[in-house]
Amino acid sequence: MDVSWGDLIYYLGDDPNTKAIAIYMETIGDARSFMSAASEVAMTKPIIVIKPGRTEQAAAAAASHTGSLAGRDDVLDAAFRRCGVLRVNKIREVFEIVELLGKQPRPKGKYLTIVTNAGGPGVISTDALIGSGGQLAWLSERTMQQLNQLLPPHWSHANPIDLLGDATPDTYAKAIEIAAENEYSDGILIVLTPQSMTDPTETARRIAEVSKKIMGTKPILASWMGGAGVLAGRNILDQAGIPTYDYPDSAAEMFSFMFEYSVNISQVRIIVLDIIDRIVF
């Protein structure tokens, strides 16, 4: 029986137990069927595709056991965007973005605020954010004034907001409340590193309380660094619907993926056949 990607997408789109659709794809097959189904179903359920073959060698490896030629990668990217599909590059990203979209609202823009108790992870997160298509949010004058009143004089005075190593759970909670009210921010990434004065469990508990005021307005992500030593705090955040990550750069990239998905969904429209016809399948 010949079953196309379009058939599967329509089937899973109608399945009430399926909340999101993740696809590993080596060839697109019937491009018209895929794009027609995806553009319809993506409006109600996220469709995430991991398609290897970006490099010439990987494309050749895929062709060796599928017997099909891979289409031009840039054309496939355009096709995925046109029909509201999000393409990721790693298996880990498939599951992380599905979880994130299920827990947090999509950002309205690409501007992220990073709140951290250590400068290094903030810098690494910034590189990852900008490298994946996001941008740091500008801190408004009101936001700066409120943070100046809350934090020691030698805080970073910029985004990422470095609370410094002695940040208490209450400092974290108040800083996040302030950051969430910043009109120029579309999302918040909270980073905690284990330091001598850090209480990762109580900090997570206070953030979970604050998040109730923010939920639904902009996405919140967290990176609780420290392995088993911060596990209790991570569990508290997970139960509060805040996705947690081992490393802050991964979290920053997930925010960018969320924004890309939002853009793709907003641009779903009638499929232009000349794009489909350029796909080799």
Named regions from a protein language model:
Residues 1-281:
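Catalytic-core regions of core metabolic enzymes
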